[in-house]
Amino acid sequence: MKFLVLALCIAAASAAVLTTEQADLVKKTWSTVKFNEVDILYAVFKAYPDIMAKFPQFAGKDLDSIKDSAAFATHATRIVSFLSEVISLAGSDANIPAIQNLAKELATSHKPRGVSKDQFTEFRTALFTYLKAHINFDGPTETAWTLALDTTYAMLFSAMDS
């Protein structure tokens, strides 16, 4: 379930409102954690077990016992790769339609599974917490990520409402 990926339309709309410098900050800081796929997904599931319950292959299982499994690593990689794709598009107005399309695809694939806006928001919160703990989250970096997430989530939620 690309549900998490979802959230990560994250930097998606960031292209529309981020300055080049802000987009570069998001990309630079993401590059320092994007290879920690398993740790990112683990942090999300640990903080919000209701999100984990949306994944049939993980629902009802002990998180610590599945963290090192191939299935967990594979799914974590899918989610982080989606986020990386969205983030790579940030910073250029020409990429806004592509980001909007990714947000729409995420909404279209997750809404029928019962994934709520609240759960997307939980994912965002867990991701933000993870980022703050693992990168240099100074004022400008926090502002850039907040703006990227705010804009992306506006696109995602708009797509969920349509």
Swiss-Prot record:
Keyword Cell cycle tagged: no
Identification of the protein by name: Globin CTT-VI
N-terminal signal peptide: 1-15
Note from the entry: There are at least 12 different components in Midge globin.
Gene designation: CTT-6
GO CC, one annotated term: hemoglobin complex
Positions that bind heme b: 75, 110
Gene3D superfamilies: Globins
Subunit text: Homodimer.
Family classification: Belongs to the globin family.
GO molecular function, one term: heme binding
Organism, scientific name: Chironomus thummi thummi
Keywords of this entry: Heme, Iron, Metal-binding, Oxygen transport, Signal, Transport
PROSITE patterns tied to this protein: GLOBIN (PS01033)
Pfam families: Globin (PF00042)
CDD domains listed in its UniProt record: Mb-like
Start and end residues of each Globin domain: 17-161
